[in-house]
């Protein structure tokens, strides 16, 4: 315990060598790559490039000279390609960072999966209540928390890429401070949720169950926020595997707690056992990451809690606000489909819960690579490698397309049996089976949308992502969806077709922005932020 508190509140930086975000290159290759982009890490100064771009013995001399061409917005990908070895290297880096993250996010998603699975077999009213509870938690809290935490995708990754690891810890402390303040209004909303849902004309029985669920779930929100912030703090430093190990223990624990607290004949207490199980799991995950940071054999720089975290909050607030705008609008449009399904009846709402849980589960795979892409691009920008960051974004899009097609094909192949995992109600099963072909197409578009959003966060363009989310979801797709559902009585099919329309619009806008990005300007903006921490 003495070691724990001494590290937690230490005023002196942790000793130990800070791992380089690009330690996979040799020292000579790192020097030459830095010179290509006019950035010398040892002097921390920007110098205009004046030598050909070379990658050691990786690429022939003719290609090395061609690579010295400075990329300008609007050029074709073929003109900017840095040679197959470099593309292969960036792909391997994304796979290295993304593979453990896929496992971690699938395990984390299984926590929601197991809750819906457990409550679904209590009855469709309980399944509908869990759907509304999940929607409420996502819109009113978790999306807001994720928006704040997304600021670390920009600030922390670029600080670590610039070899300023202690700035990463300061950014984490500022993030936790903002999250603590935001939890107060969240708790007030959840305490009065039953009355809010009745005012919104939801079924009184479902509203009552949802209100009881969320009053207990207030205990889960801080655990979720702390875990997500610490997770992003480690990911920003290229540390992914320990998060997977923690979730390998947490996911089975959540399943066990769901059984004991919901179904066990002696200690179980039914419906309210589910939020208690989730809250316990969230806090277990947070405590495990805190212990890892304090006692890990891998040096994780931590300067102790500092008053500096209370100063110069404007960059963090700037990226947090635009991150919230980007994620909240996207999540709200996604989760509002449950509210719309609630107007269609209990069976469509229960079906929507299964459909949203299924998409959420498979979404974790492309989203994991979106996090890996954001981290990799942030490191490259922080270390002054604008051209490599641009190339990495192209590789990330190609990888996302392959993964998303695989996910969509998987859900289409298992459409006949998937719904029975959640419920035995024949009416709900018929609706779910009917929607699955449309759902498979949505999964493809949603995966590309996820990676595009991750790249925007890695480059510090959350504000553009927010505008894209608002435009694609609310100004375009929502009016079309309402018109189709109301006037043509298409039900859930119309809702999911509207979601596909929103994703396609967002993908088009994201790709246009990233394709025309001035990456050297992004690099200079990042360097300016790093000098004003």
Swiss-Prot record:
The chain crosses the membrane at residues 178-198, 213-230, 242-264, 274-296, 313-333, 353-373, 394-414, 435-455, 466-486, 495-515. The keyword Phosphoprotein applies. It comes from the Eukaryota. GO terms for molecular function: antiporter activity; transmembrane transporter activity; xenobiotic transmembrane transporter activity. One of its GO terms (biological process) is xenobiotic detoxification by transmembrane export across the plasma membrane. Pfam families: MatE. One of its GO terms (cellular component) is vacuolar membrane. CDD domains: MATE_eukaryotic. Keywords: Membrane, Phosphoprotein, Transmembrane, Transmembrane helix, Vacuole. Its main location: membrane. Residues 1-26 are annotated as: Disordered. The modification Phosphoserine is found at residues 20, 23, 26. It is found in: Vacuole membrane. It is a multi-pass membrane protein. The modification Phosphotyrosine is found at residue 25. PANTHER family: MULTIDRUG RESISTANCE PROTEIN (PTHR11206). Belongs to the multi antimicrobial extrusion (MATE) (TC 2.A.66.1) family. This is Uncharacterized transporter C323.07c.
